[in-house]
Amino acid sequence: MAIERTFSIIKPDATERNLTGAINALIEKAGLRIVAQKRIRMTRDQAETFYAVHKARPFFGELVDFMISGPVVVQVLEGEGAILKYRDVMGATDPSKAAEGTIRKAHAKSIGENSVHGSDAPETAAIEIAQFFAGNEIVG
Protein backbone atom coordinates (compact mmCIF):
# COMPACT_ATOMS: atom_id res chain seq x y z
CA MET A 1 0.00 0.00 0.00
CA ALA A 2 1.21 3.50 -0.81
CA ILE A 3 2.07 6.24 1.66
CA GLU A 4 -0.62 8.89 1.37
CA ARG A 5 -1.97 11.89 3.21
CA THR A 6 -5.44 12.59 4.50
CA PHE A 7 -7.13 15.55 6.13
CA SER A 8 -8.72 15.49 9.58
CA ILE A 9 -10.77 17.90 11.64
CA ILE A 10 -11.29 17.44 15.35
CA LYS A 11 -14.66 19.18 15.69
CA PRO A 12 -15.95 21.63 18.34
CA ASP A 13 -17.78 18.96 20.37
CA ALA A 14 -14.43 17.24 20.95
CA THR A 15 -12.26 20.33 21.46
CA GLU A 16 -14.68 21.73 24.05
CA ARG A 17 -14.18 18.53 26.06
CA ASN A 18 -10.38 18.71 25.67
CA LEU A 19 -10.20 15.44 23.69
CA THR A 20 -7.52 16.42 21.17
CA GLY A 21 -4.82 14.42 22.98
CA ALA A 22 -7.02 11.33 23.34
CA ILE A 23 -7.99 11.48 19.65
CA ASN A 24 -4.37 12.02 18.59
CA ALA A 25 -3.38 8.96 20.63
CA LEU A 26 -5.88 6.82 18.68
CA ILE A 27 -4.59 8.26 15.39
CA GLU A 28 -0.99 7.44 16.29
CA LYS A 29 -1.89 4.01 17.67
CA ALA A 30 -3.30 3.22 14.21
CA GLY A 31 0.13 3.91 12.69
CA LEU A 32 -0.66 7.33 11.25
CA ARG A 33 1.69 10.29 11.68
CA ILE A 34 0.40 13.80 12.35
CA VAL A 35 2.52 15.86 9.94
CA ALA A 36 0.62 19.14 10.35
CA GLN A 37 -1.76 20.39 13.02
CA LYS A 38 -3.24 23.69 14.12
CA ARG A 39 -6.09 24.83 16.33
CA ILE A 40 -8.27 27.44 14.64
CA ARG A 41 -11.68 29.01 14.82
CA MET A 42 -13.24 28.35 11.43
CA THR A 43 -14.97 31.32 9.80
CA ARG A 44 -18.47 31.00 8.37
CA ASP A 45 -17.01 31.40 4.87
CA GLN A 46 -14.45 28.61 5.50
CA ALA A 47 -17.15 26.27 6.83
CA GLU A 48 -19.54 27.02 3.95
CA THR A 49 -16.77 26.45 1.41
CA PHE A 50 -15.57 23.28 3.12
CA TYR A 51 -19.06 21.75 3.29
CA ALA A 52 -20.31 23.18 -0.05
CA VAL A 53 -21.07 19.63 -1.25
CA HIS A 54 -23.90 19.59 1.34
CA LYS A 55 -25.31 23.05 0.48
CA ALA A 56 -28.65 21.69 -0.79
CA ARG A 57 -29.10 19.34 2.19
CA PRO A 58 -31.50 20.36 4.97
CA PHE A 59 -28.78 20.09 7.63
CA PHE A 60 -26.32 22.46 5.90
CA GLY A 61 -27.07 25.52 8.04
CA GLU A 62 -26.87 23.58 11.30
CA LEU A 63 -23.61 21.95 10.19
CA VAL A 64 -22.01 25.30 9.40
CA ASP A 65 -23.25 26.80 12.69
CA PHE A 66 -21.82 23.83 14.59
CA MET A 67 -18.43 24.03 12.87
CA ILE A 68 -18.04 27.72 13.77
CA SER A 69 -19.36 27.30 17.33
CA GLY A 70 -15.91 26.71 18.81
CA PRO A 71 -12.31 25.87 18.00
CA VAL A 72 -11.41 22.99 15.71
CA VAL A 73 -8.11 21.22 15.19
CA VAL A 74 -7.20 20.74 11.53
CA GLN A 75 -4.61 18.09 10.72
CA VAL A 76 -2.75 16.36 7.94
CA LEU A 77 -2.18 12.67 8.63
CA GLU A 78 0.30 10.51 6.75
CA GLY A 79 0.83 6.78 6.45
CA GLU A 80 0.22 3.67 4.40
CA GLY A 81 -3.35 3.78 3.11
CA ALA A 82 -3.96 6.81 5.35
CA ILE A 83 -7.40 7.68 3.96
CA LEU A 84 -9.03 4.30 4.56
CA LYS A 85 -7.06 3.71 7.75
CA TYR A 86 -8.27 6.98 9.26
CA ARG A 87 -11.85 6.31 8.19
CA ASP A 88 -11.61 2.99 10.04
CA VAL A 89 -10.20 4.74 13.13
CA MET A 90 -12.99 7.34 13.04
CA GLY A 91 -15.77 4.74 12.94
CA ALA A 92 -19.31 5.04 11.59
CA THR A 93 -20.84 8.52 11.40
CA ASP A 94 -23.55 7.36 13.82
CA PRO A 95 -21.67 6.66 17.06
CA SER A 96 -24.27 4.07 18.11
CA LYS A 97 -23.21 2.03 15.05
CA ALA A 98 -19.46 2.67 15.41
CA ALA A 99 -17.18 -0.22 16.35
CA GLU A 100 -15.55 -0.41 19.77
CA GLY A 101 -12.15 1.27 19.86
CA THR A 102 -13.05 3.93 17.27
CA ILE A 103 -12.97 7.67 17.89
CA ARG A 104 -16.69 8.10 17.38
CA LYS A 105 -17.66 5.17 19.60
CA ALA A 106 -15.48 6.55 22.38
CA HIS A 107 -16.11 10.29 22.02
CA ALA A 108 -18.95 11.33 19.67
CA LYS A 109 -22.12 12.73 21.21
CA SER A 110 -24.45 12.13 18.22
CA ILE A 111 -24.59 11.84 14.43
CA GLY A 112 -24.34 15.64 14.22
CA GLU A 113 -21.72 16.05 16.93
CA ASN A 114 -19.52 13.18 15.81
CA SER A 115 -16.15 14.60 16.92
CA VAL A 116 -14.10 14.17 13.73
CA HIS A 117 -14.03 14.55 9.96
CA GLY A 118 -11.78 12.65 7.57
CA SER A 119 -11.31 12.85 3.81
CA ASP A 120 -13.06 10.18 1.74
CA ALA A 121 -10.74 10.03 -1.30
CA PRO A 122 -7.29 11.19 -2.48
CA GLU A 123 -8.82 14.00 -4.55
CA THR A 124 -10.85 15.40 -1.66
CA ALA A 125 -7.90 15.01 0.72
CA ALA A 126 -5.74 17.18 -1.56
CA ILE A 127 -8.45 19.87 -1.82
CA GLU A 128 -9.19 19.84 1.91
CA ILE A 129 -5.51 19.99 2.90
CA ALA A 130 -4.94 22.95 0.54
CA GLN A 131 -7.86 24.83 2.12
CA PHE A 132 -6.12 24.98 5.50
CA PHE A 133 -2.38 24.39 5.04
CA ALA A 134 0.43 25.90 2.98
CA GLY A 135 3.01 23.41 1.74
CA ASN A 136 5.67 24.59 4.21
CA GLU A 137 3.32 23.88 7.14
CA ILE A 138 3.32 20.15 6.38
CA VAL A 139 6.44 18.60 7.83
CA GLY A 140 6.82 14.87 7.27
From Swiss-Prot:
Binding of ATP, residues: K11, F59, R87, T93, R104, N114
Q: Catalytic center at which residues?
A: H117
- GO cellular component annotations of the record: cytoplasm
Q: Which GO terms describe its biological process?
A: CTP biosynthetic process; GTP biosynthetic process; UTP biosynthetic process
What molecular function terms (GO) are annotated for this protein? ATP binding; metal ion binding; nucleoside diphosphate kinase activity
- Its EC number is 2.7.4.6
Which of the seven top EC classes does this enzyme belong to? transferase
Which InterPro entries does the protein's record reference?
Answer: NDK-like_dom, NDK-like_dom_sf, Nucleoside_diP_kinase, Nucleoside_diP_kinase_AS
Key words, A-Z = ATP-binding, Cytoplasm, Kinase, Magnesium, Metal-binding, Nucleotide metabolism, Nucleotide-binding, Phosphoprotein, Transferase
Which PROSITE patterns does the UniProt record give?
A: NDPK, NDPK_LIKE
- Subcellular location as annotated: Cytoplasm
Catalysed reaction(s) here are: a 2'-deoxyribonucleoside 5'-diphosphate + ATP = a 2'-deoxyribonucleoside 5'-triphosphate + ADP; a ribonucleoside 5'-diphosphate + ATP = a ribonucleoside 5'-triphosphate + ADP
Which superkingdom is the protein from? Bacteria
Do you know which SMART domains this protein is assigned to? NDK
Q: Which cofactor does it need?
A: Mg(2+)
Q: Does the keyword ATP-binding apply?
A: yes
According to its UniProt entry, the function of this protein is described as: Major role in the synthesis of nucleoside triphosphates other than ATP. The ATP gamma phosphate is transferred to the NDP beta phosphate via a ping-pong mechanism, using a phosphorylated active-site intermediate.
Q: In which family does this protein belong, per the annotation?
A: Belongs to the NDK family.
Outline the subunit composition. Homotetramer.
State what protein this is by name.
Answer: Nucleoside diphosphate kinase
Q: Which organism is it from?
A: Bradyrhizobium sp. (strain ORS 278)
